[in-house]
Regions:
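Metallo-beta-lactamase
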Residues: 1-75, 162, 167-181
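Cap/insert and terminal regions of metallo-dependent hydrolase folds
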Residues: 67-76, 80-87, 91-171
Length: 181
């Protein structure tokens, strides 16, 4: 479960030690409602492989061999409100469009009010940006907050294409939704 993870040659994951108290973890392997209206999605189907970001990431197995990390443990969190969804992702290695498709399958009738997360396309070729932008034009969230691994370079592209719908998110930013006012 806790295999060492790497980006290139640098260890890049949560280090497992025998002293780690696993009783403090809640392992999620199916769509789970944590509290009323807050859902965790532990499984994101890869529908569009062009929007995946696995390059240079590896897992070291017990025998010392390395296999590509496809981030099967990546989660997305969704706040479901009567007027729509707020979707929170981390670095979206499995693809933000794939995350959106997975969430839309569970809640097809609700619009996306907020999409917040990293898209992991910093320094990526423009075609990676275009895959995401094309999908977001089709399924347009009211607000899109991009985080650090999207990159300032790609944030500029998003701002050009989406205007005031997009903002650059940062640590400590307070975002309120209508039901939490």
């Amino acid at each position: 479960m806790f295999f060492p993870k790497f980006k290139d040659e640098r260890e890049n994951g949560m280090k497992y030690t025998r002293s780690l108290d696993l009783s403090r973890f809640r392992f999620i392997d199916e769509l789970t409602e944590l509290v009323p209206g807050v859902f965790l999605f532990p499984s994101v189907d890869i529908i569009d492989r062009k929007d995946t970001h696995f390059e240079r990431f590896w897992i070291q197995k017990e025998d010392g061999s390395r296999v590509p990390d496809t981030f099967p443990d990546e989660l997305a969190m969704v706040l479901v409100e009567p007027e729509g969804l707020s979707i929170l992702s981390a670095c979206s290695h499995r693809g933000i469009t794939n995350i959106l498709r997975t969430v839309r399958t569970a809640f097809p009738e609700l619009p996306c009010n907020l999409l917040l997360g990293g898209f992991h396309i910093h320094n990526a070729e423009e075609s990676k940006y275009q895959v995401i932008a094309d999908y977001l034009h089709e399924y347009l969230p009211q607000k899109i907050g991009v985080c650090h691994c999207t990159g300032v370079d790609k944030y500029a592209f998003f701002y050009k294409d989406f205007g005031d719908r997009i903002f650059y998110n940062h640590t400590g930013k307070l975002i309120q939704t209508d039901s939490l006012l």
